[in-house]
Amino acid sequence: MYHNFLINSTVPERTVRFLISKSKSIAVIVILLAVLVVLALLYRGNKAEEQFEQGTTMAMDTVFMVKVAGDKPDGYIELVNKLDAALDVYDEDSEIYKLNAKQNANASDVLLDAVKSSLQAEEKLSSVSITAGGLIKLWDVNGDNPTVPDEDDIQKELSFVGKDKITLSGNSITLMEGTKLNLGCCAKGYACDIIEKKLSENNVSCAIVTFGSSTLLYGKKPDGERFVTAVTNPFEPSETLLTVKTDECFISTSGGYERFFEQNGKTYSHIFDLETGCPADTDIMSVTVICDSGIMSDMLSTELYIGGTEMVKEYLASDEYMIIAIDKSKNIYASDKLSESITLKDKSFTLK
């Protein structure tokens, strides 16, 4: 008999922020997690399931969940809370919020490593930047009053975007006047990388970590089978579109259906094209990236969403990344290496 274990939430992170305060009980969070799901892992038998202990909390305005075999979840909860205190750009007490306000700070090792890791990942990409915080704040898609800004204001914020707008010297981080950091494009994937290191140090045999749209599948399942992950239908987020079998890996998904607002009959998502300063105009509904790096899975899924199907096709034969992308015509583009691993659940879609 199969037992479903729900590991990730489809609820928009902005919605989570309004529905749940950090003081709410873990039980409420778990109920939300169980109802609103992107990914699911299937475990065979009660005996294997009993080897795991689970912990859940709120961090960076979304649900963090760890399920670990052979260890207690408390240390991982403590670690993600430490990351949250440094990287949550919406928390006025966070380190990154204070850096944005002062434009200069002697950073903690946590913030400094996150920024360095993000900038290194950006070297492989062209459409994603952690320096776009001002642009994101201008549009306020994640806030109470999102609106389409004036073009002059958009261009002004774009002038503050770029790797050359941030200077690192020792533990010091200096931002060009007007530049603001926002690690929303990578923070959860980065957190999964940090959690993986701790799992390895603790000699954990198997763990599942889910943090918003990013997931870490670690080690080997007790039953010896591969992990089975369910990918949501972006047109009907409560439904499963397909399942994919993988070994241990990082998985991140980006999609404009997650967070958006409408104005004058047009929909604007939370993912920005840094060429225009506007939400990406793309033929993609969602992109899932599977690879051996949390931060790259997170940032590349965003990059491919912005780049659309033409960019997606360039990655389908990649040795480093496995891709599953769904376009607005219900076509599914999947990496060659996944051809034997995907099971399509909704036959109204076409697997290319």
What is each stretch, according to the model?
Residues 2-352:
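Mature catalytic core of soluble alpha/beta enzymes
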